[in-house]
From Swiss-Prot:
Species of origin: Mycoplasma genitalium (strain ATCC 33530 / DSM 19775 / NCTC 10195 / G37) (Mycoplasmoides genitalium)
Subcellular location, record wording: Cell membrane
Segments crossing the lipid bilayer: 42-62, 67-87, 97-117, 128-148, 196-216, 241-261, 281-301
A GO cellular component entry from the record: plasma membrane
Main location: membrane
Keyword Plastid included in the entry's annotation: no
Record bears the keyword Transcription: no
InterPro entries listed in its UniProt record: DUF2179 (IPR019264), N-reg_PII/ATP_PRibTrfase_C (IPR015867), UPF0750_membrane (IPR051461), YitT (IPR003740)
Topology versus the membrane: Multi-pass membrane protein
Protein name: Uncharacterized protein MG443
Keyword annotations: Cell membrane, Membrane, Transmembrane, Transmembrane helix
Length: 395
């Protein structure tokens, strides 16, 4: 026993094998990890960039195809489509102006009480960042939509597809966006296929966009204010909540903007008069494609923004006490324990810090650790399940 005690106290010289060298490795299973600690100017630049892209894609993939976006915005889209149909006695220019005001700007005004709610219940920074996105994306969308000739803006997919798909996409683009496609109409086969492709593209993009907004500390507004509040209160993943809330709102939106508005149009068209007010008109390809898009968005958000997934962090450092004090001064109340280890080469007793943290907090913790010890080893292990109480940072 005395021999081993003396052995542990002795500094062992470790010979590095020939052909080996010490290298720095840094990887993360958290997507966009650098953006979690982004400075405020960069956050606003990215928010406005996302808002411009969002406005353009909404015009191309949603407004012109009869699809719907998600949350409360789908209600304003459905209402705008219904009003456009009801105002058939108005001049075409007036109808389009009213339609675009309702489609884009009404959503901003509906967000006002939700913004107040968010400011009081969630926080100042989150609400301000979200408000910038809501206002910017819808104002940009409105300005683009009133540009002369924007009604004839061709779909983005048209130039990279074959002749048949181009024809289908062109027909889709020129439709009013108010009449749902019919499963029974074989002539619309290519158009229905292109609708699902559009829904997939928008759903995937929207998942990335929403995730980036969450990572930056904001949201897309509307129902997001409510889902974020509920997710933080119940400590649940945002992705699944988004799907259920958006699905419920979407049913109402399609009932107004596609079923009612579409039936009012079809009853004046001889060839399709019998399809008006049919149940099949409600369960149209537009509905299924939009649901598919929502599901895809929720899946992408759950993957890119795993807020309530946890990981175990192990810190192997020679500056243990300083790192410990830095983590404690962070005021996040992380679980923190210190374990003894035995070096496999040196047979020296050392200590390491072990902590359990949410995925989204890992970049922040690593930043704190690196400020103390740039050469320490940080090991991160996924936790598949957890049962018990843990302190969570609320902002």
């Amino acid at each position: 026993m005395k021999f081993f005690n003396n052995l542990f106290k002795k500094e062992s010289k470790i010979t590095v094998a020939s052909g080996s060298k010490r290298v720095r490795i840094s990887n993360s299973f958290l997507m966009f990890s650098n953006l979690y600690e982004a400075k405020k100017p960069l956050k606003y630049v990215l928010v406005y960039l996302l808002s411009i892209i969002n406005a353009f894609l909404l015009l191309i993939f949603i407004q012109k195809t009869g699809l719907y976006s998600f949350g409360i915005s789908s209600l304003t889209q459905g209402f705008a489509r219904l009003v456009f149909v009801l105002l058939k006695s108005f001049d075409e220019t007036q109808r389009l102006l009213i339609f675009n005001i309702l489609y884009w700007l009404l959503y901003v005004f509906i967000n006002i009480p939700l913004i107040i709610f968010s400011y009081k219940k969630i926080g100042k920074n989150f609400t301000i960042l979200s408000t910038h996105f809501v206002v910017a994306s819808n104002v940009f969308g409105f300005l683009i939509s009133i540009i002369p000739g924007s009604d004839n803006l061709p779909p983005m997919l048209a130039s990279i597809t074959d002749t048949n798909f181009w024809k289908a996409a062109k027909d889709l683009n020129q439709s009013a966006g108010f009449v749902p496609f019919l499963w029974s109409d074989t002539s619309q086969g290519n158009v229905i296929i292109s609708t699902f492709i559009y829904a997939a593209i928008y759903g995937f993009y929207n998942g990335i966009s929403v995730s980036l907004l969450y990572i930056l500390g904001g949201s897309a507004g509307g129902a997001d204010f409510l889902t974020q509040y509920y997710a933080r209160k119940k400590n649940r993943s945002v992705g699944s909540i988004l799907f259920y809330v958006n699905s419920f709102i979407l049913i109402i939106a399609i009932l107004i903007g596609s079923f009612v508005a579409g039936s009012l149009l079809l009853q004046d068209v001889n060839n399709y008069r019998d399809s008006a007010w049919e149940v099949s008109l409600f369960f149209s390809p537009n509905l299924i494609a939009t649901f598919f898009s929502i599901l895809l968005t929720g899946t992408v958000v759950s993957y890119l923004f795993p807020r309530y997934n946890f990981a175990e962090i192990k810190v192997f450092t020679d500056k243990l006490e300083e790192v410990r004090k830095a983590l404690l001064s962070d005021n996040a109340n992380h679980s923190l324990s210190i374990q003894e280890t035995l070096g496999g080469y040196s047979l020296l007793k050392k200590k390491m810090i072990v902590s359990v943290s949410m995925y989204v907090e890992i970049p922040h913790l690593i930043k704190i650790i690196r400020q103390i010890d740039k050469d320490c080893l940080v090991s991160i292990t996924r936790i598949r399940g957890i049962d018990g109480h843990i302190y969570l940072r609320q902002n």
